[in-house]
Curated annotation (Swiss-Prot):
Enzyme Commission numbers on file: 2.7.8.7
Key word Lipid metabolism present: yes
Protein's recorded name: Holo-[acyl-carrier-protein] synthase
Entry-linked InterPro entries: 4-PPantetheinyl_Trfase_dom (IPR008278), 4-PPantetheinyl_Trfase_dom_sf (IPR037143), ACPS (IPR002582), Ppantetheine-prot_Trfase_dom (IPR004568)
Gene encoding the protein: acpS
Similarity section: Belongs to the P-Pant transferase superfamily. AcpS family.
Domain of life from the UniProt record: Bacteria
Annotated residues for binding of Mg(2+): 8, 60
Broad class of enzyme this protein falls into: transferase
Keyword Lipid metabolism among UniProt keywords: yes
Cofactor list: Mg(2+)
Organism: Anaplasma marginale (strain Florida)
Keywords, alphabetical: Cytoplasm, Fatty acid biosynthesis, Fatty acid metabolism, Lipid biosynthesis, Lipid metabolism, Magnesium, Metal-binding, Transferase
GO molecular function, one term: magnesium ion binding
Known role: Transfers the 4'-phosphopantetheine moiety from coenzyme A to a Ser of acyl-carrier-protein.
Amino acid sequence: MIVGIGVDLVSVRRMQQLLERFGNRFTTRAFSEVEIRDSLQYKNAHAVARHFAKRFAAKEAYVKAVGLGFGRGIEMRGVSVFNDALGKPRIAVSGDVGHNVELSLSDDGEYAIAFVVLHV
């Protein structure tokens, strides 16, 4: 049974501006160690911005699906987005509430989008 749906759209350009302006101060507050480590595989700033934009969109879509929002029991770093061995995007949540999570990520170069479905 579906218990929540969330979607979010993030500007890759805006993410790149945040990364340029705040650097590690931003990434260490918003992203997990896994997400930061995974970003190291990219060689140019635009690819890094796309990586983080997709993950940021996934976090926002997840909290929308849960219906709580950040700061209401869910911390941004507590939601970690990664790819499994087959490349499928996954979400791990600190203090997981027991939902199964389906995640789809995409980008077109200018925008990143995430769609989350929670089910039991």
